[in-house]
Amino acid sequence: MNAHDIIIRPVITEKNTALMEEGKYTFEVAQEANKPMIKAAVQQIFNVNVKAVNTMNVKGKLKVRRTRNGQQSGYSRSWKKAIVTLAPGERIEIFEDL
C-alpha cells in the first residue's frame, strides 16, 4: 500500500487544533491500515519522527431525509481516525498556518 493511500486527509477541528500544540496531529486513514503502516506513512510523507500512533474507528451516523414520498434513511460512511504523536521538537509545517 502506498503512503498516500494510507493517509487520506488531515482532520481539522477546534479540538484537534488544540492538540497540535502538544505535537499531536489527526488524520483520516484507510480502514485496513494498522499502526505500523500509519507510522511509516507519516514519517515518509512529512519527514518527521513519530513517537506514538492511536487509532479509532468512527461509526457512521444515521441520516434521515424527508422527501415528498416520506422519509428516506441511510448512514454516513464509517471511517478510521489516527492521532499521531510526534517526537519532542518535531512539527508538521503545513499545519502551522492554521
From Swiss-Prot:
Gene3D superfamilies: 3.30.70.330. The keyword Repressor does not apply. InterPro entries: Nucleotide-bd_a/b_plait_sf, Ribosomal_uL23-like, Ribosomal_uL23/eL15/eS24_sf, Ribosomal_uL23_CS. GO terms for cellular component: ribonucleoprotein complex; ribosome. The keyword RNA-binding applies. Disulfide bonds: none annotated. Keywords: Ribonucleoprotein, Ribosomal protein, RNA-binding, rRNA-binding. GO terms for molecular function: rRNA binding; structural constituent of ribosome. NCBIfam families: PRK05738.2-4 (NF004363), PRK05738.3-2 (NF004366). One of the early assembly proteins it binds 23S rRNA. One of the proteins that surrounds the polypeptide exit tunnel on the outside of the ribosome. Forms the main docking site for trigger factor binding to the ribosome. HAMAP family: Ribosomal_uL23_B. Belongs to the universal ribosomal protein uL23 family. Part of the 50S ribosomal subunit. Contacts protein L29, and trigger factor when it is bound to the ribosome. This is Large ribosomal subunit protein uL23. The lineage of its organism: Bacteria, Bacillati, Chloroflexota, Chloroflexia, Herpetosiphonales.
